Amino acid sequence: MLLRLLLAWAAAGPTLGQDPWAAEPRAACGPSSCYALFPRRRTFLEAWRACRELGGDLATPRTPEEAQRVDSLVGAGPASRLLWIGLQRQARQCQLQRPLRGFTWTTGDQDTAFTNWAQPASGGPCPAQRCVALEASGEHRWLEGSCTLAVDGYLCQFGFEGACPALQDEAGQAGPAVYTTPFHLVSTEFEWLPFGSVAAVQCQAGRGASLLCVKQPEGGVGWSRAGPLCLGTGCSPDNGGCEHECVEEVDGHVSCRCTEGFRLAADGRSCEDPCAQAPCEQQCEPGGPQGYSCHCRLGFRPAEDDPHRCVDTDECQIAGVCQQMCVNYVGGFECYCSEGHELEADGISCSPAGAMGAQASQDLGDELLDDGEDEEDEDEAWKAFNGGWTEMPGILWMEPTQPPDFALAYRPSFPEDREPQIPYPEPTWPPPLSAPRVPYHSSVLSVTRPVVVSATHPTLPSAHQPPVIPATHPALSRDHQIPVIAANYPDLPSAYQPGILSVSHSAQPPAHQPPMISTKYPELFPAHQSPMFPDTRVAGTQTTTHLPGIPPNHAPLVTTLGAQLPPQAPDALVLRTQATQLPIIPTAQPSLTTTSRSPVSPAHQISVPAATQPAALPTLLPSQSPTNQTSPISPTHPHSKAPQIPREDGPSPKLALWLPSPAPTAAPTALGEAGLAEHSQRDDRWLLVALLVPTCVFLVVLLALGIVYCTRCGPHAPNKRITDCYRWVIHAGSKSPTEPMPPRGSLTGVQTCRTSV
């Protein structure tokens, strides 16, 4: 160690007594840092403090690029000169296997990608602190030595935010620009000036300009003033030094401008395209905070994670973009039409193609024409009401009036006629009334036969038609009159047209009396089988009426049994009943009985005594003639209840007219027979179930027994003792070769050993 110190002292000996290094400080700057050489004798600690005072640190050339910049700055100096760099090692910190051999940068780390040691590492104890100096000549190798010795100079490194380029020489300029760096280094040979540097320009006219390297509003750093800087020159010589446009200011200065799509560069003279280096994928336009803005073509949109990139827009997700079918592809979409249609000129709409389209258009026109004819039929049907207003009894849910006398020669005397107080419920609202769709409509409330809506009514022979019983009743006021379309039977003679019997009620206000329309019985078609009122309820009750010959002083009564609906829904005007074909018995019977499909208890069966029955009708029905007719006659009893008619789309409850019966009849009725038949059918079903269930249980038990038998009672191998097993194993290998082998597939000779523990 002492020998090395002596060698170092001997190397520095010739310089003792001589002038220090007479070279001026100089620097080399790049876009991000500067290296400055100060030829002043300092120890390592003094050099480090000098760099810190200027805002830098001792040089730390970590990469080959930084080392090359230091080499260009030092150049070919004297061979004996040394310069301190920022590399030191503490005592007893030798790490020869590392690139820096245990040395540490003055910044506190050991990261490096470049080393240039002058001597190989020596395995010593490292008892003292060591520092590294750079040779000023040759290959600028690194030498380690004592940190307390003074060397010829030191290298400082300065970092900064940005740099301004050196100014270009102008035509009216008196000399090169002089630059002053923040670390107080003055020179005219800089290529880059760190942030905060000052440039002084001297012009021939005697006036100069001073510029400062500052931050620009759009980002980065630049000179505070753009050229040209010297007055009196104007734009005549060489366009004022401007690349695109030169503008002479009022004060004699000139400024440069760029055409549209370009921006002025940092030198103040040249122009650059901001989109030339922009990372836009499709389209770029100058402007914006970065000097450019990215845009996408039609059919694309900017990506959410990267606005410079464009992604496809799925136009088919937009509602109504195509009339029928839409297919999306990258950059656009296309509309398609289904089979039988073709795309129109707009590329969106579809129209029927060829003859099919013409036929479709013709069908559409015919449909519209039919709708117009239907509307005309409605108008004609309503015009028929002008001369057809007559006095009719109120709707079933209205107050009762005097009972009709049916235009008969006799007038039956009912004890209840003196106090006609029938408790009909008040309607919550009047049912809506609409015009009939066709002249012949099946919306009838009070008729002598049930209204058949779901099927066409067959034409009946004249011999099977019931007599006509005209309805008469007290006259009503003009406000209470209800329009009626008279019953019309084109297939029947007038002598055999059915009579229309209506319920007599008290007068109601006009707002609660919708018109009563009688039914005409032509052959109905399915299209004309809808009720006249848009909100109607049809009682689907199958009613069978036995009509005997009516003796004198007997009133024909028909009772329809069924469930009574609540009075809150009286908004129906149509009865759809399906009558069964039963012969009408002309002989006198004590009562008239009506049966329905649902079984009804005998308490609900109503009979009419003979004493209260009116005289026979003028024309009796022929005996033993099957018909599809019933005779619903409106009740006049003060305690009878009006039938409640449900909606057509709901359930079909039974229609009921309640009449008091003085004496219940004991004769068996068709209702009881129907109930017994249904009970018998139900008993047959239960008998079938009672037979099937035990049979299934018996089969399951047999199956279980078979499984148990197969698993527990099958053949098993006999149990053997463990000694037998050993004997079998031992003698198995000593069989004589002449012993015959059992045939393949046979269990003969196969011994199994099963032991019990």
UniProtKB/Swiss-Prot annotation:
Tissue spec. comment: Expressed in tumor endothelial cells but absent or barely detectable in normal endothelial cells. Expressed in metastatic lesions of the liver and during angiogenesis of corpus luteum formation and wound healing. Expressed in vascular endothelial cells of malignant tumors but not in normal blood vessels. Expressed in stromal fibroblasts. Strongly expressed in pericytes. Expressed on stromal cells and cells with lymphoid morphology such a T-cells.
Example of a GO cellular component annotation carried by this entry: extracellular exosome
Record's bilayer topology term: Single-pass type I membrane protein
Transmembrane segments: 688-708
UniProt record, GO biological process: anatomical structure regression; cell migration; endothelial cell apoptotic process; fibroblast migration; fibroblast proliferation; lymph node development; positive regulation of endothelial cell apoptotic process; positive regulation of fibroblast proliferation
UniProtKB keywords: Calcium, Disulfide bond, EGF-like domain, Glycoprotein, Lectin, Membrane, Phosphoprotein, Signal, Transmembrane, Transmembrane helix
Sites carrying sugar chains: 60, 401, 428, 448, 456, 459, 472, 519, 541, 543-545, 587, 593-595, 598, 601, 612, 619, 623, 625, 627, 630-631, 636, 640
Intervals, Cytoplasmic compartment: 709-757
Presence of keyword DNA damage: no
Stretches assigned to the EGF-like domain: 312-351
UniProt keyword Ribonucleoprotein present: no
Compositionally biased intervals (Polar residues): 748-757
Positions of the Sushi domain: 162-232
Extent of Low complexity compositional bias: 618-627
Extracellular side: 18-687
Signal peptide: 1-17
Entry function: Cell surface glycoprotein involved in various biological processes including angiogenesis, immune response modulation, and tissue remodeling and repair. Participates in pericyte proliferation through positive modulation of the PDGF receptor signaling pathway. Acts as a scaffold for factor X, triggering allosteric changes and the spatial re-alignment of factor X with the TF-factor VIIa complex, thereby enhancing coagulation activation.
Quaternary structure and interacting proteins, as annotated: Interacts with PDGFRA; this interaction promotes PDGF receptor signaling pathway. Interacts with integrin beta-1/ITGB1. Interacts with insulin receptor/INSR; this interaction diminishes INSR autophosphorylation.
Protein's UniProt name: Endosialin
Organism: Homo sapiens (Human)
Gene name per UniProt: CD248
